[in-house]
Amino acid sequence: MIEIKLKNPEDFLKVKETLTRMGIANNKDKVLYQSCHILQKQGKYYIVHFKEMLRMDGRQVDIDGEDYQRRDSIAQLLEDWGLIVIEDSAREDLFGLTNNFRVISFKQKDDWTLKAKYTIGN
């Protein structure tokens, strides 16, 4: 989990929606699998890989460096876009950044099937 701050409280829904369009793409079938979610816990906000969410629910999952790297790269991109600020304490632990995910533009959203492998609250 990467602790973040929102620039404005209303940015929560923007970040949540944007994350639905970031992940692993199957270009042939035009399906995008969401990699990360925004989590609010005890008044703090986090960018969390879906496998971390499964693990918090007590499920056995294999999460590797590439998963963490993808999460960290997505968080960095959200920060570059001005949607979030990564907490300094979290910044120290970021994995090397990479471009191992796809971002679907808002305009392209209706052309793709967006799938989440985890649903918060279920």
Swiss-Prot record:
InterPro entries attached to this UniProt entry: Transl_repress_RegA (IPR002702), Transl_repress_RegA_sf (IPR036516)
Record carries keyword Repressor: yes
Domain of life, source organism: Viruses
Molecular functions per Gene Ontology: DNA binding; RNA binding
Residue ranges of DNA binding: 15-37
Presence of the UniProt keyword Repressor in the record: yes
UniProt keyword annotations, A-Z: DNA-binding, Repressor, Translation regulation
Alphabetized SUPFAM superfamilies for the sequence: Translational regulator protein regA (SSF55064)
GO biological process terms, semicolon-separated: regulation of translation
Role of this protein: Controls the translation of a number of proteins (such as regA itself, rIIB and at least 35 others) by binding to their mRNA.
Name under which the protein is recorded: Translation repressor protein
Gene: regA
